[in-house]
Amino acid sequence: MTVTDYLRREELCLAHAVPTAEGAIRIAIEETARTLHGASALVVGYGRIGMALAPRLRALGMQTKICARRCETRALAQMQGFSAVPVSALAQRAAAADVIFNRVPVLLLSETVLKALPPETLVIDLASRPGGTDFDAAKRLGTRVVWALALPPEVRRCHIPEKAVSAEFHRKNVEKSVESVLNSEKRLRNCEKATKTGIISSKEF
């Protein structure tokens, strides 16, 4: 039996990144007492969601910087016009940010980092459990943190359009998953047949 987790298909993950980014922006608008235009943003983690979020923040007029662990990820962010720093510079960059968006489910926003934040700084943690923020320390320090675990379902609840993850999209994604499995099994049978006969056709692979 072949088991396929269609929720891990890349096109579905990318589709979820857009409403998650839009939901994060909505939270930033609601939770800050100023316009996002002219404010500074730090995006921690530059995967699918980080890459969907950063250009949208920049389009709103935010001074957007990226913090990423891997040098090739930072190079990609720089190629796309963003200033990017390693995790070792997180505390320094975070202290200068008005809004911090975290997508890394590893404790990066530690008590040490949180202590460096101005009182008006907003942290929006988009990471899955256990999150990337020391929530206990944030509570003690009075740091404003929103752990947005409910996105993108929360986005749907607030009536922000999410056509990319509609029932129709899921239906098509399941069909693609089934087609992919069938094609893989066909290639495997052809390979076994070619091994037995010693005849390999380029059309079969």
Where do the protein language model's features map onto the residues?
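Cationic, amphipathic, low-complexity segments that mediate targeting or membrane/lipid association
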Residues: 170-205
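Glycine/serine-rich phosphate-binding loop and adjoining beta1-alpha1 elements at the start
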Residues: 1-37, 148
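Conserved Rossmann-like nucleotide-cofactor binding loop
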Residues: 49, 72, 129
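Glycine-rich adenosine-cofactor-binding loop
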Residues: 37-57
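Hydrophobic anchor at the start of a short beta-strand
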Residues: 3, 64, 84
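Rossmann-like adenosine-cofactor binding region
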Residues: 78-153
